[in-house]
């Protein structure tokens, strides 16, 4: 972005409304009061520093998790204005900290481009913190003010002199609001800060954790999003050595795109608008996809790489094996939905499309060998898609009520209400038999799988759909897969993976999760996927039987037995060792069981781990195992 020395003082701070109701209804402002909402507080403060960086006035940001789980964020920007605000009659910094929708991002004067959740920013963090301190280095003086739950403890005061500029904010979230947790996750903060460093090339961001064992990371990438794509592809075999990097500006919209193809079968496209991850895509992403498909088809036609009778490659074909980052900086972003995850600006589509088309066309002409590889990969994907289409027809159910087309080994439930229905995907026929006998037939369906399903990370869709176990899963769930997926057609709102508590069981569970993540991801995003927790131990003392789900629970049960007791302890290796009534009581009875919901906090991290664990390359997997071996408690060997 170009640096323009604009006035950034108290006159640039606009006030829209007062700070009432934030403490009463925090979810309206930060999404939730769970761990996600807690971390959102940090992003609100960091986003203000990022706005300074995007305007060209800040190149260093620091985030510290203090010993008491409070947070300190520092930057070397211009410092929040401290002059008296004309309308409010209070220092501008106090207005920003205490008035909702007050800030330099509303009138277009202080910042041309900014992020932040609808600009609610610092005042919401202040309202939801037991304590917040702000220290501003500006015009040679250090200004300081402290707040409690959004209310100033004293007036802004000058506490010293300084030869630098910048802002330091220290806050402690309020445990009365964040009742679930007030403990910050280092990895959650670090992965987003790394993302922000990639998206703002040259910016240096440091995170430090002062709790138990001090650790820190520093993120600084001169390559920007091209470095980001290299980072995402580092465990994969790439088709061309360096990412294709494109940047340009039209009508005040700045577009930066980096793409690199690998030999995998899935695409990973991440889009951002003003540094905000647009999970649901939007106009910038669709503009990129349109341009990509058109350019590759035009190139292939012009260079006679297709037969004349061949149809054009589809978007799905040309995106196979693609890793791409699209980042736009736009003056007046229109985000659809309160969570800001879909960009709606129509100009972003045309500008992204035209800039990408122009640069990517030139790249293909200048690199004919790479162009040929991309077209060949698309053609192979097209053939696989046609084969998959035929295979898919075999798996498609004729209607949600027509049971005849369901897989033969599925023991369906009698309920047709998907919201109360659940399906257990069970490892092995013997456990499947026990589960069928032990279940509640009204709302519980059982689908036994024979052996291990295909590793979808290493296979194309046509091969995946030829696998009987996967076809049984697709047909039973009823949603379709990939681009045809429709969450409304889900026949069950709880899909519970139930495997043995050993290495093989864990492997089968990972294979099923890999399939869901790659081809039925909305099931995970909507919270439909669960993992059953069968007991590890059965403790029998006379006629009294208790079950333990882990070593700590086993020790607790044993400690409560009489001193001279000699209980029988059985460690379950497989589900088949339990009879139907035991399986129901321990693992399937909704009133007694424990099931773990599978959630998706960080799609990029999940993508990377699936690729490391399930992909072709051995080296990244070995490194991962060596790094994480110290966390293993029970080895099943």
From Swiss-Prot:
Keywords: ATP-binding, Cytoplasm, DNA-binding, Isomerase, Magnesium, Metal-binding, Nucleotide-binding, Topoisomerase. The record marks 452, 455 as: Interaction with DNA. GO terms for biological process: DNA topological change; DNA-templated DNA replication. Pfam families: DNA_gyraseB, DNA_gyraseB_C, HATPase_c, Toprim. The keyword tRNA processing does not apply. GO terms for cellular component: chromosome; cytoplasm. Mg(2+) 1 binds at residues 427, 500. Its main location: cytoplasm. Binds two Mg(2+) per subunit. The magnesium ions form salt bridges with both the protein and the DNA. Can also accept other divalent metal cations, such as Mn(2+) or Ca(2+). Belongs to the type II topoisomerase GyrB family. Few gyrases are as efficient as E.coli at forming negative supercoils. Not all organisms have 2 type II topoisomerases; in organisms with a single type II topoisomerase this enzyme also has to decatenate newly replicated chromosomes. This is DNA gyrase subunit B. It comes from Halalkalibacterium halodurans (strain ATCC BAA-125 / DSM 18197 / FERM 7344 / JCM 9153 / C-125) (Bacillus halodurans).
